[in-house]
A protein has these predicted regions:
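General helical structural elements
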Residues: 9-10, 126
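N-terminal secretory signal peptides that target proteins for export/translocation
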Residues: 1-5
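Scaffold/interface architecture of coatomer-like assemblies
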Residues: 23-519
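Bacterial N-terminal signal peptides
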Residues: 10-19
Length: 519
């Protein structure tokens, strides 16, 4: 009997439950859709070069990889001086506004600019700096030195006297003068290998300096401007033939012959233009725009590929000739006072690590749009490899870790060799109060001088036991695998890195003898 009652009770509950559910409104399903947006900073001017301030979303079109993309929003960003912000915004609002104020990074190329050219330009450079400060800009001055690499001369400042003192003390490099004199004294030997190699070293250091600069300034909020002041990179002088007529073409047609040490395979063919492309991609990834002023007498100034390329690809501008300072000042003030920030929906909803071409059009008649050429979304490993590549290009610039290195090539049968060597590493530099650095990553790269081949090895060095035992030095011996090496001279670059960001690099040379004809 109990079983029957129980069944009847459950049946009643079931009917009531169904009736109750039917009486309720059935809830609708909700699906969250996350739309990924990309930000573009663009400058729009009329035919006379004046900024157009009244554009709306419908005035713009954004194309990615040739396809029209939806625009989510368009905002006119107006940059203010520090003084204006502090005077007109209270408390927390002022702190927010200060993150995106009128600021410019000024990079003086004291590596490629000879001492005479820089000395002649000091007056114009001082006037440019002071005029920018008068307009409300704060300037961060940096210099690219032959030995020190990238050096910060002062943080963002509007102190006219201090900035003028720094500019007045700038010194150019004597090496370009010596190389030019050597080249001119032997016009029949202009393709001399040793001379060209010295010019190419300057060129590699230039690229390394730019690769150093980008991570240094990337944290500055918003659109970041770099004004590069230089007499130009030694591109023509680094070519296999310094006489472009003899080479059978102009500078641009020959520049692909310039090849750099690329142990990490960042580029397809290790060429100079490909490295510039990497610099442009990294700059665009971090919203950095290059402007260039090329120093030198009017009749001596030739178009510089690097300045032209980087400014064009990052949405900036490049100035040379008689009116370079006047025109440069006008455009730099204009572009760093107002710009449009466009948020659009990219083609891919996930970061794919590929380059995406971007083009921005304005429907306003006569409008001219300056924008970044495109973007690559890098992963952290990609960025780390680019920092290492910079160290391999200019070993002198990376001296954060102190060590000595030696190596030699030993025969390993036939035309094969192994490299054996030692690192002498002081350990005191890895002892910290809070935490010791216990592991280093050791890279060795071997570069064939004809740039046809690169060999790269990597190893982890464990310092923990030696540090615990209180040792002052570590002698680390290494041996490479068998390498097939032709007779000739090879550059060997040894790089040490640790997790706190420090990098130390040494550049060595080895000679592989030619055994042909020997008994």
């Amino acid at each position: 009997m109990a079983g029957v009652k129980r069944a009847f009770f459950l049946a009643i509950i079931s009917v009531i439950s169904v009736a109750f559910l039917l009486a309720q409104e059935i809830p609708r399903e909700h699906h969250e859709v996350v739309v990924r947006l990309k930000l573009l900073d663009v400058i729009v001017t009329d035919a006379d070069g004046n900024f157009i301030p009244d554009l709306l979303r419908d005035d713009f079109q954004v194309f990615e990889d040739g396809r029209l993309r939806p625009i989510e929003s368009v905002e006119l960003v107006t940059l203010k001086s520090r003084e204006d912000i502090l005077a007109n915004y209270p408390g927390e609002a002022a702190q927010q506004e200060l993150k995106a104020r009128k600021r410019i990074h000024v990079l003086f190329d004291c590596l490629n600019t000879d001492a005479i050219t820089l000395r002649r330009a000091r007056g114009e450079l001082s006037r440019l700096v002071l005029n920018l400060v008068e307009e409300g800009f704060e300037l961060k001055l940096l210099a690219l030195h032959p030995k020190k690499g990238l050096e910060v001369l002062c943080d963002f400042s509007s102190d006219k006297e201090h900035l003028n003192e720094i500019v007045s003390a700038l010194e150019g490099n004597l090496t370009p003068l010596f190389l030019a004199a050597e080249r001119d004294s032997s016009p029949d030997q202009t393709s001399d290998f040793s001379l060209r190699l010295q010019y190419q070293e300057l060129l590699q250091k230039s690229i390394s300096g730019l690769l150093q600069l980008i991570p240094m300034i990337k944290e500055t909020p918003g659109r970041k401007t770099v004004l590069l002041i230089t007499s130009g990179f030694p591109e023509k002088e680094s070519l296999p033939y310094l006489d472009s007529e003899k080479a059978g073409g102009g500078l641009i047609t020959q520049i692909d012959k310039l090849k750099f040490f690329d142990p990490f395979g960042l580029t397809r063919n290790s060429t100079y233009p490909e490295f510039l492309e990497e610099v442009a991609h990294l700059a665009n990834f971090n919203l950095i725009t290059f402007y260039g002023i090329q120093l030198g007498q009017v009749e001596e100034v030739e178009s510089n590929f690097a300045l032209s390329y980087l400014s064009k690809k990052t949405g900036g501008a490049y100035f040379r000739g008689a009116n370079k300072f006047t025109l440069g000042e006008k455009v730099i003030k204009r572009d760093n006072s107002r710009y449009y920030e466009i948020a659009y929906v990219p083609a891919s909803q996930e970061e794919d690590g590929k380059f995406h071409q971007v083009k921005v059009k304005c429907k306003r008649k006569g409008a001219r749009v300056h924008f970044r050429d495109g973007y690559v979304e890098y992963e952290e490993e990609d960025l780390a490899n680019r920092r290492l590549a910079s160290a391999f290009l200019a070993p002198d610039f990376y001296q954060d870790i102190s060590f000595e290195a030696e190596t030699e090539a030993r025969p390993a049968g036939g035309d094969h060799f192994i490299l054996q060597g030692k690192l002498h590493l002081p350990l005191e530099q890895f002892k910290k109060e809070d935490k010791m650095v216990e592991k280093l990553t050791f890279f060795i790269g071997i570069n064939e001088m004809n740039q046809e081949k690169v060999h790269l090895g990597q190893q982890e060095i464990d310092l923990s036991e030696d540090l615990r035992q209180g040792k002052k030095y570590l002698i680390y011996e290494f041996t490479t695998t068998r390498l097939k090496l032709k007779p000739g001279r090879y550059g060997v670059v040894i790089t040490l890195t640790c997790k706190d960001g420090r990098t130390g690099t040494r550049h060595l040379w080895i000679e592989i003898p030619d055994k042909r004809g020997t008994s």
